[in-house]
UniProtKB/Swiss-Prot annotation:
The keyword Cell cycle does not apply. This is DNA helicase/primase complex-associated protein. GO terms for biological process: DNA replication; viral genome replication. It comes from the Viruses. It comes from Psittacid herpesvirus 1 (isolate Amazon parrot/-/97-0001/1997). It is found in: Host nucleus.
Length: 648
C-alpha cells in the first residue's frame, strides 16, 4: 500500500481538526493523493507556535504517563516523496486498553480526533529538557474514509410497516471507527446505543476485536491473512506443494465457464410462480470456508469461521472482515482465489444435481446461494433438501482437498442455511427476483435499484417495490388495477421521502466510479483551487449525492410524453459525501436520485402485470408479444411533473 503526504506542514497546518478536511482536499487537487488508490495519507504535525516542522524534530521521551508505554526505537528510511533520510521513530501504546466505547447518539469523529490530538501534544510537543533522551517526533497517519459516525438505532426506534427491513438496515449501520497513527494509541472506537444495545453490543465488539487481534479493519484485505503464523521452512515447502496439487484440471476448466462464480438462471425468465412450494438457501461464509480448506492450518481464520458459523452473539461483527478478505483475495493470493472460485463452481454443480434428484428445480443460483421450486408431486421437505445439499457440498469439498493418505481434511464444514420458504414469486433474472409467502406474509426482494445500500432512500424504495408486488398478488384483477396500485404506492413513496430533503445521509448512494464528477463553481475558491482534475480521484470508494452542474437552472424541463421518462433534470454530477459533512453545504439534485428509482418501481409493476394478465389480452395479427406487452403496460406510469415542485 502506497503512502502519500498530506503536505500539511508546508501549508502551515497547526493540528486543528477543523482544517483537516480542507488540507486533504488541497492535496487531492494538487494531484499528490488518489483516495481511490488505497493510499495511506501522512500528516506532518506542527509545533505549538503554528510553525510547521518536519518529522525529524526532536521531543522528550514521554515517561510521565503511567497508562502508556513507549515502544522500542526503530530506524526507518523515507519518506518516498522527497530525498530519503534516516529517522528514529517510536510509538506510544496504551497499557490497559485497546478499545473506546462511545455513545452512538452523540459520537463525533472530530471529537475523537481532538482526543488523539491532545494525547499527541501531551506526549510529543512538550519542551525538550536539556538532558532528556530524545526520540524523533512521529508522524500522524490516517486512512480515509475512516469514520462512520451515523448512529445505529435500535429496532424499537424504527417506524413503519417494514420493521424487518428497517431492523436489518440498522444493524448494517453499526460499524467500527479507527484512527490509527504511529505515535498514537491505535484504538478501535465502537459506537454503542444506550437505548438499544448496551452491554451486549460492547461485549460483542470486544469479542470480534479479540478474534481478529485488532488487525481488522486497520489492515483491510490483509487483516485475516496476518493471523496465519509463519510456519517452519519445511512446512512452507509442503504447503506450497499441496496447494499446487489442488488446482486440478477440472477445477481450472470450471473457471472458463464461470470465472467469478456460478451464476445461472432458469430458462424462460421472466416468469411467475403461484401457489407452489419455493425455498431459498444460502451458504454461510462460503468463500472464506473454501479458502480455509485451501490453506489448511490457519488457526486464526478457523477460529473466526467457527464463531461465525455457530452464529454466536456478536458474530455479525466478523462478517465485514470475512467479506473484505475474499473481496481482495485475488490481490493477496491469486492461486487461492482461483481455487476458491473453481471449487465453488464444482460444489454448485453437485448441489444442483442433488436438488434435482429430490424433486427441486433451481430457478436461480448465484455464487453462494440459490432458490427454486419443488415439483408438485415431491414430498421432500425444505429441511430435508437443505441437509442433503449441505452433505453433498461437504463431500465434494473433501474430494477436492483431502490427499490419498487422508491428510488435508477441511478445518471447517460448510453450513447451508434455509433462508425462507415461500408460495409465490417473480423471476426476472438471476439477480432480480421477488419471493412471497402468502400464509406468513414473509417476503424477500432482490434487484431493486440501490437495494444493497444503507441509505434511507434505498430502504424506502425497496419497501415500496415489495408493497406493490404484494398488493398486485393480493387484489389485482387486471392491468388497470395494477396501474392504480402502483400510482397509490408511489404517491406514498414520494411523500415519505419528501420529509428528508436536505438530509445528505438519507440520499447518499455508493460511488459508481465512472460517473461524471464536477464540483460546482460556488465552492471553488482561491484557497482550494480548481477541482475538476481531482474529481476522478474520488470515484469508486466513497458515497455520493447528485448536485446540479448548472446552479442557475436546477429545475426540470417537461417534454412530450409527460411520464417519468418525460422529465429531464438539470445536468447532475456526483459529489462525495465526505466533503459535505464538515466542510460544505450543497444543493442536492433530488431528481437525479429519484427518477432512476421511479423507473425501477414502474418496471417491476409492468413486468409482473404482464406475466399475470397476458392471457387476458389477445395479440393483434400485426403485432408480436413484445409489442403488445409494451403497449398494454405503458399505462402503468407516473407523471413526476405532478410532484416535482416538492423537490424544486
Amino acid at each position: 500500500m502506497r503512502m502519500r503526504s498530506l503536505s500539511a506542514a508546508s501549508s502551515g497546518y497547526n493540528g486543528d481538526p477543523r482544517g483537516l478536511g480542507l488540507e486533504r482536499l488541497k492535496t487531492v487537487v494538487r494531484g499528490k493523493l488518489r483516495p481511490s488508490g488505497s493510499e495511506i495519507e501522512w500528516l506532518w504535525p506542527s509545533d505549538q507556535n503554528n510553525t510547521a516542522s518536519p518529522a525529524g524534530a526532536k521531543t522528550d521521551q514521554p515517561t510521565s504517563a503511567p497508562r502508556f508505554f513507549l515502544t522500542r526505537e526503530a530506524t526507518v528510511f523515507g519518506p518516498s516523496w522527497k530525498p530519503a533520510s534516516r529517522q528514529i521513530v517510536a510509538s506510544v501504546l496504551p497499557v490497559t486498553g485497546e478499545m473506546v466505547m462511545v455513545s452512538a447518539e452523540r459520537f463525533s469523529c472530530m471529537a475523537l480526533f481532538a482526543v488523539f490530538l491532545k494525547l499527541y501534544r501531551g506526549f510529543y510537543m512538550k519542551p525538550v529538557a536539556p538532558c532528556a533522551t530524545h526520540v524523533r517526533r512521529p508522524i500522524m497517519l490516517a486512512q480515509f474514509p475512516v469514520f462512520d459516525s451515523r448512529p445505529s438505532h435500535g429496532p424499537q426506534e424504527q417506524s413503519g410497516s417494514h420493521e424487518p427491513l428497517a431492523r436489518a438496515a440498522a444493524q448494517r449501520r453499526t460499524k467500527h471507527n479507527f484512527l490509527f497513527m504511529p505515535g498514537f494509541p491505535c484504538l478501535a472506537c465502537v459506537p454503542i446505543s444506550a437505548s438499544a444495545e448496551r452491554h451486549d453490543r460492547a461485549m460483542a465488539a470486544c469479542r470480534a476485536a479479540s478474534l481478529t487481534e485488532h488487525l481488522w479493519p486497520a489492515y483491510g484485505i490483509r487483516a485475516l491473512h496476518m493471523l496465519n503464523r509463519t510456519p517452519a521452512a519445511a512446512s512452507i515447502t509442503r504447503a506450497v506443494a499441496r496447494r499446487s496439487r489442488l488446482l486440478t484440471a477440472d477445477l481450472t476448466r470450471s473457471l472458463e465457464t464461470f470465472p467469478a462464480g456460478t451464476i445461472t438462471c432458469a430458462a424462460g425468465a421472466p416468469m411467475i410462480f403461484s401457489d407452489c412450494r419455493l425455498a431459498r438457501l444460502d451458504f454461510s461464509a462460503f468463500y472464506p470456508c473454501l479458502y480455509a480448506a485451501y490453506v489448511g492450518k490457519h488457526r486464526g481464520l478457523t477460529k473466526i469461521l467457527h464463531e461465525r458459523l455457530r452464529r454466536r452473539a456478536g458474530s455479525e461483527d466478523l462478517k465485514p472482515a470475512l467479506v473484505t478478505m475474499f473481496g481482495g483475495l485475488r490481490h493477496v493470493d491469486a492461486n487461492g482465489y482461483r481455487f476458491v472460485v473453481g471449487a465453488s463452481n464444482i460444489i454448485a454443480k453437485a448441489v444442483e444435481q442433488t436438488a434435482n434428484r429430490m424433486g427441486f428445480g433451481v430457478a436461480a443460483y448465484v455464487k453462494d446461494g440459490f432458490w427454486g421450486a419443488f415439483d408438485s408431486s415431491s414430498k421432500t421437505t425444505a429441511e430435508e433438501l437443505r441437509a442433503e445439499c449441505e452433505k453433498a457440498a461437504n463431500a465434494t469439498l473433501a474430494r477436492l482437498v483431502v490427499d490419498k493418505d487422508g491428510a488435508g481434511e477441511p478445518p471447517v464444514s460448510l453450513v447451508l442455511r434455509l433462508e425462507g420458504v415461500y408460495t409465490d414469486g417473480l423471476l426476472i433474472n438471476a439477480n432480480k427476483y421477488w419471493l412471497f409467502n402468502s400464509e406468513s406474509g414473509d417476503s424477500f426482494i432482490c434487484g431493486v435499484m440501490g437495494g444493497h445500500e444503507r441509505s434511507g432512500l434505498s430502504r424506502e424504495t425497496t419497501a415500496a417495490a415489495d408493497d406493490i408486488l404484494k398488493k398486485i398478488k393480493a387484489s389485482a384483477k387486471s392491468i388497470d388495477d395494477v396501474e392504480a396500485i402502483a400510482r397509490s404506492r408511489i404517491d406514498a413513496w414520494i411523500y415519505a421521502i419528501f420529509g428528508h430533503r436536505g438530509d445528505v445521509e438519507f440520499w447518499a448512494e455508493q460511488t459508481p466510479g465512472d460517473k461524471d464528477f464536477l464540483i460546482p463553481e460556488e465552492i471553488r475558491t482561491t484557497t482550494v483551487g480548481k477541482l475538476e482534475a481531482a474529481d476522478s480521484c474520488l470515484g469508486g470508494e466513497l458515497s455520493y449525492v447528485f448536485i446540479p452542474k448548472n446552479t442557475q437552472d436546477t429545475g426540470a424541463a417537461k417534454t412530450k410524453g409527460g411520464g417519468a421518462r418525460g422529465w429531464h433534470s438539470a445536468p447532475a454530477a456526483a459529489f462525495p459525501c465526505s466533503l459535505v459533512e464538515d466542510v460544505f453545504c450543497i444543493k442536492i439534485n433530488y431528481e437525479a436520485h429519484l427518477l432512476p428509482r421511479l423507473e425501477g418501481l414502474l418496471a417491476w409493476s409492468r413486468i409482473y402485470a404482464w406475466l399475470q394478465f397476458r392471457n387476458q389480452i389477445p395479440l393483434a395479427d400485426d403485432e408480436d408479444e413484445s409489442t403488445t406487452q409494451a403497449k398494454e403496460t405503458a399505462r402503468i406510469d407516473y407523471n413526476y411533473g405532478d410532484v416535482s415542485f416538492l423537490f424544486a
